[in-house]
Design a protein with these regions (language model features):
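Generic hydrophobic, aliphatic-rich segments that mediate packing or membrane embedding
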Residues: 40, 66-73, 270, 319
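Non-transmembrane, membrane-proximal soluble domains of secreted or membrane proteins
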Residues: 2-22, 45-220, 379-425
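Intrinsically disordered, low-complexity regulatory segments
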Residues: 213-380
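Alpha-helical transmembrane segments
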Residues: 22-50
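Short alpha-helical segments in extracytoplasmic peptidoglycan/chitin-binding modules
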Residues: 29, 167, 263, 356, ...
């Protein structure tokens, strides 16, 4: 069932118990769905009109249904008291001792996570909403003695492995929902409150990353296509016209003054501006939104050999216009590979690619040119801190990453951050 549900990787101490509960619930739902479906179709067949032309007003006379209901109540009581409530108590209610835990504050805002570490003294410094600025997102008072060694990071949570983490979660503006899928932890962030949540990581980020290593077959990249670019047309402008599907290919001028510029859409307002200035003819081309989803698979140069559009570049409007202005009407392109979240896990010296560098469409084309067919890749940041609040694209993009380190690595990182504080004074 876990494989069927495609649950995320697990790096927390109690994650497997949560996964077992999720799997159990789905098995129960599956069995109930089968059972109720069988009962439903049986009832349709058993009590069909042709077999029961006259209604029976007596109904069920046995106590079978009553006992079934009693059995269902007993089963659900056992499920709650023996499984759900103990797991909830162990995983959520029973907090570890503070002296044995890493303690941080995380304050959400539209649209970022601000992480506040108490520093060496273990005390959180004073914060004040009146001190909040772009450079001081939580309004920490650096004049306060407890705040002098406090470390603040943005969308980055560093924590040591094999040690409980207690997070005091809050929000500056609206309700957010902090989620750590790989750590099986999630809690809403409420404005004006600091709500505690906890988990215990048992794998480092590197160990989790090793579990994401996969081989990618470059022959499975989206197919390369020959793309015919839109033609440059000479359009006649008339009052009341709306040519919003067209984009200007040159400046529209009157008496040496520019009225509209190359690259502007010919919407109703711009058409009116042309009419008002007695401009009746312009050169333009149709806009094709599909082109912006494609990437060039080779370099395109002007007459003198200068590169206009490099290989691996999205065909946005500016580049399409540039190609057409240089008499290039056809290009080879493909759809994006959608490997933005991966890094290379090996060196590929023949394509000048080193281990740990980001997978880009340009580098994939370089690998193909070098004759490499299979590559080893892994997730760049396998452990995310995301906003699970279903309130639009801004919340969806409100993501950071978690770096789980050994205690020694964490101590070194913290000392580096503290040194940065001293240097900035």
């Amino acid at each position: 069932m876990r494989e069927f549900l495609n649950l995320p990787l697990d790096a927390s101490e109690n994650g497997y118990k949560i996964d077992e509960m999720i799997a159990l619930i789905h098995w129960i739902m599956f069995i109930l769905a089968i059972g109720w479906s069988v009962f439903f179709y049986y009832s349709i067949y058993k009590f069909r009109k042709s077999n029961n032309p006259v209604a029976n007003y007596t109904g069920v006379t046995t106590k079978t249904s009553t006992w079934l209901e009693v059995g269902l109540v007993v089963f659900e009581t056992i499920l709650l008291t023996a499984f759900a409530m103990p797991l909830w108590a162990e995983r959520v209610v029973e907090f570890p001792a503070k002296e044995e835990s890493t303690i941080v504050r995380i304050i959400g805002e539209q649209f970022a996570w601000n992480v506040h570490y108490p520093g060496v003294d273990g005390k959180f410094g004073r914060t004040d909403v009146l001190l909040i600025t772009a450079d001081n997102p939580i309004g920490i008072d650096r004049e306060n003695e407890d705040a002098k060694d406090d470390v603040i990071t943005n969308n980055q949570l560093n924590i040591p492995v094999n040690k409980p983490v207690i997070i005091y979660l809050g929000s500056k503006d609206v309700i957010h929902s902090l989620s750590f899928p790989v750590l099986r932890a999630k809690h809403d962030a409420m404005p004006g409150q600091l709500i505690p949540m906890w988990f215990k990581p048992v794998k480092t980020s590197l160990e989790v990353q090793n579990e994401t290593i996969q081989t990618y077959d470059l022959t499975k990249l989206p197919a390369t296509k020959n793309i015919i670019l839109p033609k440059i047309e000479e359009l006649t402008i008339s009052a009341g016209g709306n040519l919003k599907n067209y984009i200007l290919m040159e400046n529209a001028t009157k008496d040496g003054n520019d009225v509209l510029y190359s690259g502007m859409l010919l919407d109703a307002d711009n058409v009116k501006a042309l009419v008002d200035n007695s401009i009746s003819k312009v050169k333009a081309r149709k806009v094709n939104p599909v082109l912006q989803t494609l990437l060039t698979t080779e370099d395109y140069k002007d007459a003198t050999g200068n590169i206009l559009v490099p290989m691996g570049t999205p065909l946005i409007d500016d580049f399409v216009s540039m190609l057409l202005q240089n008499n290039i009407s056809q290009v080879t392109a493909r759809h994006k590979a959608k490997l933005n979240y991966f890094i290379y896990w090996e060196d590929y010296s023949s394509a000048s690619i080193s281990k740990g560098s980001a997978v880009t469409d340009l580098s994939l084309e370089q690998l193909k040119i070098a004759g490499i067919k299979n590559i080893s890749i892994a997730l760049a940041t396998p452990i995310e801190m995301a906003c699970a609040q279903l309130c639009g694209l801004g919340h969806y993009r409100m993501r950071g990453y978690v770096n789980i380190q050994t205690q020694e690595e964490y101590d070194i990182w913290m000392k580096e951050k503290e040194a940065e504080l001293v240097a900035s004074e």
